Swiss-Prot record:
<dbReference type="GO" id="GO:0070006">
    <property type="term" value="F:metalloaminopeptidase activity"/>
</dbReference>
<feature type="active site">
    <location>
        <position position="349"/>
    </location>
</feature>
<dbReference type="GO" id="GO:0006508">
    <property type="term" value="P:proteolysis"/>
</dbReference>
<comment type="function">
    <text>Presumably involved in the processing and regular turnover of intracellular proteins. Catalyzes the removal of unsubstituted N-terminal amino acids from various peptides.</text>
</comment>
<protein>
    <recommendedName>
        <fullName>Probable cytosol aminopeptidase</fullName>
        <ecNumber>3.4.11.1</ecNumber>
        <ecNumber>3.4.11.10</ecNumber>
    </recommendedName>
</protein>
<comment type="similarity">
    <text>Belongs to the peptidase M17 family.</text>
</comment>
<dbReference type="InterPro" id="IPR000819">
    <property type="entry name" value="Peptidase_M17_C"/>
</dbReference>
<feature type="binding site">
    <location>
        <position position="268"/>
    </location>
    <ligand>
        <name>Mn(2+) 2</name>
    </ligand>
</feature>
<dbReference type="InterPro" id="IPR023042">
    <property type="entry name" value="Peptidase_M17_leu_NH2_pept"/>
</dbReference>
<dbReference type="InterPro" id="IPR008283">
    <property type="entry name" value="Peptidase_M17_N"/>
</dbReference>
<keyword id="KW-0378">Hydrolase</keyword>
<dbReference type="Pfam" id="PF00883">
    <property type="entry name" value="Peptidase_M17"/>
</dbReference>
<feature type="binding site">
    <location>
        <position position="263"/>
    </location>
    <ligand>
        <name>Mn(2+) 2</name>
    </ligand>
</feature>
<keyword id="KW-0464">Manganese</keyword>
<dbReference type="InterPro" id="IPR043472">
    <property type="entry name" value="Macro_dom-like"/>
</dbReference>
<keyword id="KW-0479">Metal-binding</keyword>
<keyword id="KW-0645">Protease</keyword>
Amino acid sequence: MAGGIEITFEPLSSRGTGGDLVVFVGDDLALSGAASEALGQPGTELVARAAASERFKGKAQSALVLPAPAGVEADRLVVIGLGSEKDRAKIDWTVLGGFTAGKVGARSARVVIDGLGFAASARDVADFTLGARLRSYRFDQYKTKKKDEDEAGAALTLRVADPSAVEAAARSAEAVAEGVILARNLVNEPPNVLYPEEYARRVSELTQLGVEVEILDVARMKEIGMGALLAVAQGSAREPRVVIMRWNGADDAAEPPLALIGKGVVFDSGGVSIKSAGGMEDMKGDMGGSAAVVGTLHALASRKAKANVIGAIGIVENMPDGAAYRPSDIVTSLSGQTIEVINTDAEGRLVLADVLWHVQATYKPKAMIDLATLTGAIIVALGQDIAGLFSNDDALSGQITAAGEAAGEKVWRMPLIPAFDKAIDSKFADMKNTGGRHGGAATAAAFLKRYVNDVPWAHLDIAGVGMSSTPSEINRSWGAGWGVRLLDRLVREHYER
């Protein structure tokens, strides 16, 4: 039961008692045949009178909530507007599901989905369930006092023309919801609970779904030469981990995989270049990129995706102590390239550098996508509703952009020009880990690009969308779980065979 909500299906002709009865109307307030039957004459007349008195016009994402009259199979009537015919032609079913779940709350409801000049496909209904599950998510396990409604679980019964025709798509959507919820849970966890070793242990539970999991400890990282990642970790009492997840779902096991790489800084104090106190508590979410990768692997394995996908995350804690790495240190990365440390708070790119190099050298992927809450500069550039995309490949960039648009997780492609690469040249090493005040998101991407060889690659800077992002109809959580829906859509459309 993903998202704390139970969802079932029944035919349009079904009848029931109690709970909410949800119907949809356009801006003409016309009811579909099935909705009229469910409401009966008393309910239909009440809706017409109430709409007139409340000036309810059926606009998109508007609602009218009424006590049900005698003779109607419900305790409440919830009438949700879908807007004009033009609005109804471009319904975002995921958002509609979230909006509906928000109006129902922690109650049981029957939702009549049909008519109004459109046919809801199995995919539409599945997207509706996805939105409802994501809206119903709560992270409250550390609260000792809960409201009664927090203890209750919502239950939606969707009335559709053919229940059996939508169940397979709905199961796939539930797998995606579970992946998003896992990612949200990971981001929301406090860092004293989700330290690197514990994070790696939780990821190892994906083996129950058929995912192969390998954990690299400090000894192994030293053996292969992950000097950049280890430098970041050396100020923490908690040892770092690198976790490799392998989902081999393609018919051809030898087919090169898609590789997803995530930054997993479970807490970022800034290290010796320490952050200011205000807002530092949010730095538990500096592992949002890794959470998206873990959530995506969970989703792909749960729905048995026909694709080979590698997930790799570098998990560290960036802390200041007597052993911490310092500005002016020079560290040697796994690639052999040397890095002059200018700012210890630019640590995520050091973590990603070693993981990117390890993945491309070991697994020979057909493409690599990394996700990271990497820079505050991307928030200045794009705000908190869209992620920054940097890429060395137009085709991959286009696929990611289209998948994000379809999934409701939008990206905007940013430039990668030689000037950004030149900005990270160092007098003392092969490169430095910051490029100055200007173009911070772009110079960070240019740094990562130095760890990518001849393979299509994209970098998603999700600092604005991964945590504390704008609330929406499908997300009221601090940790958004951003990226799981985009990556699942990308795999579904371009990598499954």
